[in-house]
A protein has these predicted regions:
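Flexible, surface-exposed loop/gating regions in the mature catalytic domains
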Residues: 133, 147, 151, 322, ...
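Catalytic Cys-His active-site segments of thiol-dependent hydrolases/isopeptidases
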Residues: 384-389
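CBM-like, beta-strand-rich accessory domains located in the C-terminal region of large
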Residues: 390-676
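Carbohydrate-active enzyme catalytic cores, enriched for enzymes
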Residues: 138-141, 165, 208, 212-383, ...
Length: 676
């Protein structure tokens, strides 16, 4: 709008970074002026609106007049489908560029030129896009089949183009209004049972498709909403409730660090992808949340391919004044996105803190076969990482990156989730439950049984983060006897030392210490430790497909059908830290556990062997070390040199009572998850 152009021109007078960015934009525009580059119509348009130099407008007009001579903007492969897909993402992008160019150069065109270009753009883009995705009787797509990022991109960019053409083509006004009325339905899509489609938006905010595609789909919708508001002054655009929760969602799935902002790369995303584009558009829509300013301030210019950066037209126009961005956001340190199965827990919002991210939800399309997988960011590095992804046509995508083998999960007889789930989806999804955060104690439960129910009847993974250790407890049961293995994707130097594995990357370092069902074999002479875990090094492609990297599998030699796994991930303050927690394996009647000693504190952790579903009507009472409880798992902490009976800090997982002698420490008729 003229107002936004005027605002940025005023800001340039006292913001050197904007002046520098404008220099880059003008240079790109001048190159496009010589080449008559359609793909730089946004640069040419901005250059004209800022400088009022008619050369840019004339170039835009020339480019558009040539563009509408094309027979089709369709894609050959898409057009060969039955029925033909007349529109796709490439057309959507062309629609946006055409809309920007047509609107910018409108006043230098004759009425006949306007009409010719408008009719051509309607034929090439508006009618195919809105016709395929929205309008009767030509619509071929539904929200159930293609209601993810493609829907908003194709229909909303087609809608923006229609908005720019409505002076010459009054008939498209009705199409625009139909789109405006339909847009909230995209946000509200509730999923379906018959085709195993996920609900698009979580009640806590955000979209299940991965950060990359969530941001893209939302960005495209917001661009149309802004364009509609700009062309309908004084009219109420209506409410889309999901928008209010997006700043929290984008922030909760990011990891602030020294250098570029990282984000969770579950599914088809990369850790350098960020959501500044959607955040800027939300801010422009009037959502003046300080969290948005904080988020945008974390993003490094140019850190990913499609961003709204200062030296690109949209970033130049929509980056707000960040001088009042808070140092840290006022957000909780944990977040459960239960509808699509993500959780994050962090020890602070400072840069280079520690964050644990867990996923157990739907599998389909951009959502990988990664039920119960996790990522650990520590001291600026995803020290335990996701395997990543690559370009979809490459065989490595379907054969590795999408599959369970590329994630930190448990396999049974070498199998994870069935490969067919990439196309057909997981009929039974994974879940996350019972997120607790009490500062130095955090917990979440992952249930990945459904996606691997062809082999498993129980696939539960508990994450209990106490002080500087994340305890990962696996409760596994299969339909038949076989072999279990634990996969680890690490990002750093991997060194086995006795029963521990040390992983280090710069200032970031963790120790991986398997404790149950067995320790890691103490040496390479694994034949001397026939019952202990042995390890396998597996080569896999790197994300850039330029080489290979190694991930690791810890194998249990025994053939069984029920296992309790317990692995400690020790978060080291420095790679050279020697004062690590001492962990003693302990067992008693119907329980296993640990005694952990560190820095004058003792923590006893107990896992109830009767509480894993093996009892039907009898309750799961155990009496470890003088305690009496039916809890699935519990922990008590107390100062070294004092008695456990005097403990004040308790974690109770799925328990109705905790007693000792004649004293009741906790009681509830129903089993609860409690930190007290």
């Amino acid at each position: 709008t003229p107002q936004r152009i005027q605002q940025v021109k005023q800001r340039m007078q006292h913001e050197p970074k904007l002046q520098e960015a404008w220099g880059d934009i003008k240079k790109t525009a001048d190159e496009a002026l010589q080449k008559k580059d359609f793909n730089r119509l946004d640069y040419l348009s901005l250059a004209y609106l800022v400088t009022d130099n008619k050369e840019y407008a004339d170039a835009i007009k020339e480019i558009l007049l040539k563009a509408v001579e094309a027979e089709s903007w369709g894609d050959v492969e898409m057009m060969a489908r039955i029925p033909a897909w007349r529109s796709q993402l490439g057309m959507a992008h062309k629609s946006f560029l055409s809309a920007v160019g047509y609107d910018a150069a409108y006043n230098v065109m004759s009425s006949s030129e306007r009409k010719k270009i408008a009719e051509g753009l309607k034929r090439l883009a508006v009618e195919p896009a809105l016709g395929d995705w929205l309008l009767e009787p030509t619509r071929i797509h539904s929200l159930n089949s293609m209601g993810h990022n493609w829907w908003t991109s194709c229909v909303c960019q087609g809608g923006i183009l229609a908005l720019s053409l409505q002076n010459e083509l009054p008939e498209v006004k009705e199409w625009v209004e139909q789109l405006h009325e339909s847009l909230p339905e995209w946000f509200d899509f509730a999923g379906d049972v018959l085709q195993q489609k996920a609900k698009s938006f979580d009640e806590a905010g955000g979209m299940y498709e991965s950060l990359n595609y969530a941001n893209f789909g939302i960005q495209e919708a917001l661009l149309f909403r802004i364009a509609w508001i700009n062309t309908h002054p004084g009219q109420n655009p209506g409410d889309i409730p999901q928008l209010a929760k997006l700043p929290s969602y984008f922030s909760q799935v990011c990891y602030p660090r020294t250098g570029m902002l990282h984000s969770l790369n579950f599914g088809d995303s990369h850790k350098n992808v960020s959501a500044e584009s959607s955040m800027m558009l939300l801010y422009a829509l009037g959502m003046k949340d300080p969290t948005i300013l904080w988020y945008i301030a974390q993003v490094e210019q140019g850190q990913h391919r499609d961003g709204f950066f200062l030296n690109r037209p949209m970033g130049f126009l929509y980056t707000p004044d960040l001088s009042k961005a808070p140092a840290v956001p006022q957000l909780p340190t944990s977040q459960l996105l239960a509808d699509f199965g993500w959780a994050t827990m962090r020890d602070s919002w400072e840069k280079d803190a520690t964050m644990l991210a867990v996923k157990s939800g739907h599998t389909w399309n951009h959502s990988h076969a990664d039920a119960n997988s996790f990522i650990v960011f520590h001291k600026g590095v995803d020290i335990i990482k996701d395997g990543g992804n690559c370009w979809y046509p490459n065989p490595a995508y379907r054969n590795y990156f999408f599959q369970s083998q590329a994630h930190n999960v448990v396999l049974f007889n070498g199998e994870g989730q069935p490969r067919e789930q990439q196309y057909s989806g997981s009929t039974l999804r994974g879940y996350l439950h019972h997120l607790l955060d009490a500062g130095n104690v955090k917990y979440v439960l992952a249930n990945g049984t459904g996606p691997v129910s062809n082999n498993f009847s129980r696939n539960f993974r508990h994450f209990l983060w106490m002080d500087n250790v994340i305890y990962m407890i696996d409760d596994l049961k299969t339909h038949k006897i076989g072999q279990f293995e634990w996969l680890w994707h690490t990002n750093g130097t991997y060194k086995k030392s006795g029963v521990d594995v040390n992983v280090a990357n710069g200032n970031s370092s963790v120790v991986i210490r398997p404790l149950y069902p067995r320790l890691l074999a103490k040496s390479d002479f694994v034949h001397d430790y026939p019952e202990d875990l042995y390890w396998e090094e597996i080569e896999a492609p790197t994300e850039d497909l330029k080489g290979t990297e190694t991930y690791y599998s810890f194998h249990l030699p025994a053939e069984v059908n029920r296992v309790k796994g317990l692995t400690a991930i020790i978060l080291k303050e420095t790679p050279n830290e020697k004062d690590l927690p001492q962990m003693e394996r302990r067992e008693g009647q119907d329980w296993i556990g640990l005694r952990i000693r560190h820095k004058g504190k003792v923590t006893d952790l107990y896992i109830n062997q009767l509480a894993d579903g093996r009892l039907m009507h009898s309750n799961s009472w155990i009496m470890p070390d003088g305690w009496m409880t039916d809890a699935y798992m519990f922990a008590v902490s107390y100062p070294e040199g004092t008695e456990a009976a005097d403990a004040k800090d308790f974690f109770i997982c799925h328990g109705s009572a905790l007693r000792r002698d004649k004293e009741t420490y906790f009681s509830s008729l129903s089993k609860l998850f409690v930190i007290q």
